[in-house]
Amino acid sequence: FEVHTDLDFNETTGVLEIKPSGIVMEYSDFELEGSLDTKNNMDLDLSIKGTKPNFDMFIAFAPANLIPVLERYKNAGKIYFNANINGPSNKGNVPLIDVHFGASKAFLENTAKAKRIDEMGFKGHFTNGHKRRMSTMEFSLSNITAKLEEGSFLGSMMIKNFEEPEVDMKLDADFDLDFIVKFLNLKNVDNTSGNISL
């Protein structure tokens, strides 16, 4: 984890300006810029952006025990992540968090089994909402697409209110069961055949 930054602190106004900076993580790089108002409730105005030609950006946020599993798959695509953090951040205040992320023209390939998912894409969004608490959090994935060896997958998902989750999911999928078993390296599944349509 490395941070390359240029900071400018104005003692009169109490504003710390973060000039365009780089955050280097093991699997991804991000750009950070914005300001922190130290005299006004530690008011944040931050922008974090990242683009990558593969899924490493999402692997960077995965739980440590899941990373070796994800690393088994060859992958590429146009991946982006844009986050804005705005508002007071001290004395019990939580800033507004608004994140947009997604992928297009992507693929995942299990090279050991020669199984590949093509034409993957999705648009994602997360916010902690106007009240900046669990009850106003929203997470969505829209325009989820994927072309399987034999079949396809289309879908969307919306989760509202993380205290009492309301989930709205739509799927239109048609795929070969044996393909999924091989692609995911499922070991304890035998004699799989047939199609699944949702």
Regions found by a protein language model. Give the residues of each.
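Extended amphipathic, helix-rich lipid-handling scaffolds
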Residues: 1-17, 21-25, 41-109, 120-152, ...
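Extended intrinsically disordered, low-complexity coil regions enriched in Ser, Thr, Gly, Ala
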Residues: 114-118
